[in-house]
Swiss-Prot record:
One of its GO terms (biological process) is karyogamy involved in conjugation with cellular fusion. The lineage of its organism: Eukaryota, Fungi, Dikarya, Ascomycota, Saccharomycotina. The keyword Nucleus does not apply. GO terms for cellular component: membrane. This is Pheromone-regulated membrane protein 2.
Length: 656
């Protein structure tokens, strides 16, 4: 006890630094972070095991079906790990006629498809050509407006120059007139004797007339004023095109390329149908159990991944919250240490002043050593009376029995007794701290494990808790399987056919620069549009003639004879917008283009899954459901006990 410090021998910066590594805060928040991410690790591992177990369960019952068209034999086999009882198996012989094409319907469907494709292309190309032609016309309007403005500016400058010449001549004549007037005045002042008639005649002869300039240059002034006040514009002119004039693509219906594509598609359909179904088919069928799981592997993985990401976001959010709380508590401790440091300095200064006043001594260290033991004993006996008295009795017994053999081991033993008695008698705050830690860790783990895996879509025909449905390979199964292969093949052929039409035929034949028929039609349509545009533009100028009065400006037609060739040279048909596919094309051929002449069945097969197998599968699912909750409960209990034991040891070590 002689090593107890009455005053902390640390400076204020050292105290601030020690607040960052305060044992209680560091242990508390470190254990919380470990609990958060430890729980996440347990959840992650458990979900991985569940996913692995689910994959195994999905693979427990499987069915393999194969249909051989070469030998016209369909075989189905099944394997299952469940106990099978009361399973009956029979074999059936099927004789089926071959599938055939409804060629009339297929030809009409192809023609309708191509007709709708051409109409769609005509509409798209017509709209696009009108938009591009209007844009071309707007560009020409902008250029023409710029030329008009430039011409008006040029004429304005020329008229200003002429008026400047007018002003120069006028000023010169005005100067000469003033000079003549001054000369006449001087002559009059010299008292020349002239009769009145002679004076009038001389005055009229000496007068300089400049009124003629008003009539000569007046027109220029008025024209300049008109040009300066001109506000006419042609950019607000809008073209109205004839929408009834569009390209006609009917000539493509008789092209050799299209007829060849049509023949190839029909031949490919016939070959595919002939391969998938022969003229006579003998099928040997055996019963099989087909599993329909509640969940597919991809859906399970996506759901478990979503739950894992949700828990991971919770862990990150909790980590950020407790990290902020840790630094907030550190700042609070620093503020408390600052206040305590000031109070201690005041108390030390007060004690030193009192000691100096009583003894005249200034050596505070000497008095600290003298009074240290007494003050420490008084402090312990006041704050912890019961442990102090018990420790005192234990030490007295040790000194009485073997005072000469007292060593460090016995001293440590006495301190250990002291710590135990202190925990029992005065450790209420320790137990409160432990209870608080237990409560916080419990809440953290509970919130992290409080989630629900959403139910996945089921494949069942009626409501029920069963996980597996049985399905028997009967005549309908065999027919459905063969038709499934045929539908898949027909869909692929139709898709390839439409891609070939879009990417090869349409792209190769829709070109204004290379196809003479399209070029002639486009030229005729553009001639009509050019004439209509020029007529509308002339009408527009006549209606807005008040803006053009007073200026001598000749506006030519908007579009010239070379506009058509210029537009055709820069316009390309939008083939990228007409390469869409029609999904109903394949569906119509699958539904009405394939003829099934019938199937004759001589026997059927039945299979059943035993009740014991169903119970085993159900029990396995229930165990899988409660497995996660059991892991969480025992894991939470183990974590809480470890935390409590850990904190007790830490406090014991700190008080030694």
């Amino acid at each position: 006890m002689n090593n107890v410090h009455i005053i902390k021998p640390l400076s204020l910066p050292q105290r601030f630094f020690s607040c960052i590594f305060h044992p209680l805060l560091l242990i508390f928040f470190t254990s919380v972070i470990l609990t958060i991410w430890g729980s996440f690790s347990v959840i992650d591992i458990t979900m991985a095991k569940m996913s692995h177990a689910q994959v195994k369960r999905n693979d427990t019952v499987s069915t393999f079906a194969s249909i051989s068209t070469a030998t016209a034999t369909a075989t189905t086999t099944a394997t299952t790990t469940a106990t099978m009882t009361a399973v009956t198996t029979q074999h059936a012989i099927y004789s089926a006629n071959s599938y055939s094409l409804n060629k009339t319907f297929i030809d009409n469907t192809i023609d309708q498809y191509f007709e709708s494709k051409l109409r769609s292309i005509e509409s798209t190309v017509g709209t696009d050509m009108q938009e591009k032609f209007k844009s071309y016309t707007d560009d020409i309007l902008d250029n023409k407006q710029k030329l008009i403005n430039d011409q008006i500016s040029l004429e304005t400058e020329l008229i200003k120059e002429v008026l400047e010449v007018n002003n120069t001549i006028f000023n010169e004549l005005l100067t000469k007139s003033q000079l003549i007037n001054d000369t006449w005045n001087e002559i009059s002042e010299d008292a020349m004797t002239i009769d009145k008639d002679s004076i009038s005649q001389m005055a009229s002869n000496l007068l300089l007339n400049y009124s003629m300039f008003d009539s000569i240059f007046g027109n220029y002034s008025r024209k300049l004023k008109s040009l300066q006040n001109f506000n006419g514009t042609i950019t607000d002119f809008s073209t109205q095109l004839d929408t009834s004039s569009t390209l006609s693509l009917n000539f493509l219906r008789n092209s050799t390329d299209w007829l060849q594509l049509k023949r190839n598609f029909t031949a490919n359909l016939q070959n595919e149908i002939s391969i998938l179904s022969g003229g006579s088919t003998e099928v040997t069928s055996s019963t099989s159990i087909i599993k329909r799981s509640l969940k597919t592997n991809s859906e399970e993985n996506s759901v478990l991944s979503a739950v894992k990401n949700h828990v991971f976001r919770k862990c990150k959010r909790m980590t950020i919250i407790f990290t902020v709380m840790y630094f907030a508590f550190v700042i609070l401790l620093m503020a408390i240490e600052r206040i305590l440091f000031q109070l201690e300095n005041q108390q030390v200064n007060l004690v030193m002043s009192q000691i100096n006043g009583l003894t005249g001594q200034t050596n505070f260290t000497k008095y600290n050593k003298v009074l240290k033991s007494l003050i420490t004993t008084l402090n312990l006996s006041t704050l912890y009376p019961i442990p102090y008295q018990l420790t005192k009795l234990i030490n007295q017994k040790i000194f009485k029995r073997e005072p000469e053999k007292i060593d460090d081991k016995k001293v440590k033993k006495s301190k250990l007794f002291y710590c135990n008695w202190w925990i029992i008698s005065n450790g209420a705050h320790l137990w409160l701290f432990g209870f608080l830690m237990l409560l916080i860790h419990w809440q953290i783990v509970t919130r992290l494990t409080n989630f629900e895996v959403p139910s996945l879509p089921t494949f069942h025909k009626r409501a029920g808790p069963s996980l597996y449905k049985r399905e028997v390979w009967t005549d309908g199964n065999i027919t459905t399987t063969i038709e499934g292969f045929i539908n898949d093949s027909v869909s692929l052929l139709c898709e390839n056919f439409q891609m070939e039409v879009n990417e090869k035929f349409i792209t190769a034949n829709l070109s204004l620069q290379t196809d003479p028929n399209l070029k002639v039609q486009s030229t005729d349509i553009l001639n009509l549009w050019v004439n209509d545009t020029n007529t509308q533009f002339e009408k527009y100028l006549n209606e807005s003639s008040q803006n053009w009065q007073g200026i001598d400006l000749q506006v030519e037609p908007l579009l010239g004879s070379d506009s058509i060739n210029e537009f055709l040279g820069q316009y390309f048909l939008p083939t990228y917008e007409v390469t869409n596919t029609n999904s109903s094309f394949a569906l119509d051929i699958q539904k009405y283009g394939i003829i099934n002449r019938g199937i004759n069945i001589t026997n059927a097969s039945v299979a059943a899954l035993s009740s014991l197998s169903k119970r085993q599968i159900k029990d396995k699912e229930q165990k899988q459901t409660y497995f996660l909750h059991t892991v969480y409960k025992w894991g939470l209990l183990a974590v809480c006990l470890t935390i409590l034991f850990h904190h007790m040891l830490i406090f014991i070590i700190l008080k030694l």
